[in-house]
Amino acid sequence: MTKFTKNKQEKNIIITIKRLGINGEGIGYYKKKIIFIPGALPNEVVVAKIVDRHPHYLEGELVRIKEKSPDRVTFPKGVDPAVGGLELAHLSYPKQLEFKQHLILESLRKYHPRDYIKYKVKKTIPTPNAWNYRNKAQYQIEFNKGKSKLGLYAPNSRRLIDLPDMPTQTKETQKVEREIKKLIDKLHIRIADFRRHTDGIKTIAVRQSNATGEIQVTLITIGKKIKDLKLLASHIMKLPNVVSVFQNETQWQNPQVWGNKTIKLFGKSHITEEILGKKFKLSPRAFFQLNPEQTTTLYSEALKYLDLTPDQTLIDAYAGVGTLGILASDQVRQVIGIESIPEAVIDAQENCRLNHVRNAEYIQGNVEKLLPELKNQGVPINALIVDPPRTGLSKKLIKTLLEVKPETFVYVSCNPATLAKDLVLLSDAYDVRVIQPVDMMPQTPRWEGVTKLVLRKNK
């Protein structure tokens, strides 16, 4: 993605904003070319400056607003607007919900899966709390010009924005992040330097259980042996509600934030979260939704649309720590969960024991390979739930699903574009009964939704 290259010689231009883009930016036109302007809203007339030119579009910077939208609200004070994760914070919450319903409708129109005009796309379900809802903070730390900074990178750049406050994070996780920064400064712990590619602490991850208040800290480091890291961890353990400190080791060439190796320095191996009466142990790398209160809504919708019966076998694909399968275990004969990450499978098995679930089994491997094997073994695959990453389902998996043909399945998606694209192939054999958007991340354009598909009888 192209980095902003601001040209001071560019003149100010006046643009009327027509709509919002998929990333929450305002979209207008200048000399018949589309221009994206972050921070601008539909029906606003704005003064902007072109900061980057591409063959088919322009990138703009908002200078000032000439005619303001009635849907505009005050952006949180004391926060740099350039920070990621607040792309819609200037838009009223009811309009954010409309925008997220519009996102999936636009994606369906773009890819037009079979009979998409007939799809029932419901209104977005709002979250109970539009602020301070994220129970996991993952801040980058760096040392530059004689002082340390802790926060998030500006989109598409390596410019770290210091964050004394991030209004979507819980107060407790933010406080722990800031206290750890103070300890790093006080103890002179080495901070990784991306300019010189030197070892040290790169990222601080803090996750808090909504159910118990327990806090789990992971220090993500470049290199394994960081001087006085254990001393730092011992001080972190004294902070309120902190029950464990881990080190995750990665390398500069790894494009992901987390590396593959995690070791416990002090405390508990897991923290425990609770959803719909079930308990889940979470190790540092285990995936879990970032908005615990709204997770209850998301999973309740998924279970509602699965409409399970006691004689069914449910396949929980992309099972993670077993959340959905364990929640559904009371309603079916058997649950078989499939997950590619070994640590997550161990967590899922432990979560079964924790909840006294005896009809669920979790196996490590790829869904594309294991589904046909299960069918060949005589396992009745009549219900399925998939909760894939943003990339959606692979074509190989879709081909497998069209061969195995579970009678009904629910697709939990975090990307309307890949959902719509996948429905193009899936709609050859399945009818889409309903798409229910659920707002998991207010103030951002991030989308989540539950889709119910039923096998067409004449196929």
Curated annotation (Swiss-Prot):
Transmembrane segments: none annotated. It is an enzyme of class 2 (transferase). Keywords: Methyltransferase, S-adenosyl-L-methionine, Transferase. It holds the Pfam family tRNA_U5-meth_tr. PROSITE patterns: SAM_MT_RNA_M5U (PS51687), TRAM (PS50926), TRMA_1 (PS01230). GO terms for biological process: rRNA base methylation. GO terms for molecular function: rRNA (uridine-C5-)-methyltransferase activity. Residues 6-64 form the TRAM domain. S-adenosyl-L-methionine binds at residues 289, 318, 339, 387. It comes from the Bacteria. Its EC number is 2.1.1.-. The active site is at 414 (nucleophile). Belongs to the class I-like SAM-binding methyltransferase superfamily. RNA M5U methyltransferase family. This is Uncharacterized RNA methyltransferase LJ_1606. It comes from Lactobacillus johnsonii (strain CNCM I-12250 / La1 / NCC 533).
